[in-house]
Curated annotation (Swiss-Prot):
Pathway: Alkene biosynthesis; ethylene biosynthesis via S-adenosyl-L-methionine; ethylene from S-adenosyl-L-methionine: step 2/2
Protein name listed in UniProt: 1-aminocyclopropane-1-carboxylate oxidase 1
Gene Ontology biological process terms in this record: coumarin biosynthetic process; ethylene biosynthetic process; fruit ripening; response to molecule of fungal origin
Binding positions (Fe cation): H177, D179, H234
Tissue spec: Predominantly expressed in the petals and the stigma and style.
Pfam families found in the cross-reference section: 2OG-FeII_Oxy, DIOX_N
Catalytic activity: 1-aminocyclopropane-1-carboxylate + L-ascorbate + O2 = ethene + L-dehydroascorbate + hydrogen cyanide + CO2 + 2 H2O
Gene that specifies this protein: ACO1
Protein's organism: Solanum lycopersicum
Domain Fe2OG dioxygenase stretches: 153-253
Amino acid sequence: MENFPIINLEKLNGDERANTMEMIKDACENWGFFELVNHGIPHEVMDTVEKMTKGHYKKCMEQRFKELVASKGLEAVQAEVTDLDWESTFFLRHLPTSNISQVPDLDEEYREVMRDFAKRLEKLAEELLDLLCENLGLEKGYLKNAFYGSKGPNFGTKVSNYPPCPKPDLIKGLRAHTDAGGIILLFQDDKVSGLQLLKDEQWIDVPPMRHSIVVNLGDQLEVITNGKYKSVLHRVIAQTDGTRMSLASFYNPGSDAVIYPAKTLVEKEAEESTQVYPKFVFDDYMKLYAGLKFQAKEPRFEAMKAMESDPIASA
């Protein structure tokens, strides 16, 4: 089995740039995932985020999760649970407008730390989108502009904790799915594993590494690249020991952004020169995804194709 792609972003600044860009290209084409080291976010910032996120879970979320487990009788289940996940979560929205000041139970220091972390992640996401543009032969800024809509991108962080699970064979931490959006930046626990992706019909562990950022591609990048890059099924396996922390930040198109394959990539395809993917408004896709998240993505694309006969505003 090939090694999971780990990319040192510092090497973009020297004589290993071409090789590093090739590694990113291969990861996007063949994995849909890669792990970044030396990505520019200071280790001390990440350490503070981790410490405060784990502290907040202990103080504000842990007891609620225990009560939820008890109310649903999850510790005594005898058959596979298919309609919920063994996770405790809350969501922070950064763009187009932040909700951090409104989220209850966060102390002011944690709010400030997360605002700062979000700005750094936003910058990194946009840098990565331009690296993808370079590899795809698209002009710099193409993907950011494709995501922009009228109010800019949607950007937010799902803060998750996966407590020890007594029945990991029957309850998933998070059921298998592809991500609906654009590019996802994950800061995950470096001690408690659980994230897996599907490659060549095998589930492969995404290795926990201290101070790394795991990147994966969402459905919208598959559409814009006309299938050259793919969103990939992934899941979280619950563990019997240790609580796994996960901060997944989703840099997504704006709600009214019109998504469609880049014309140059359609033209570059072989003789057929066909556009395989539909054209749609991102918010319409999200409404469909909300009910079908844990099902295959292909029927979602087909459903959006069926809607294409309707005129799309601003297309």
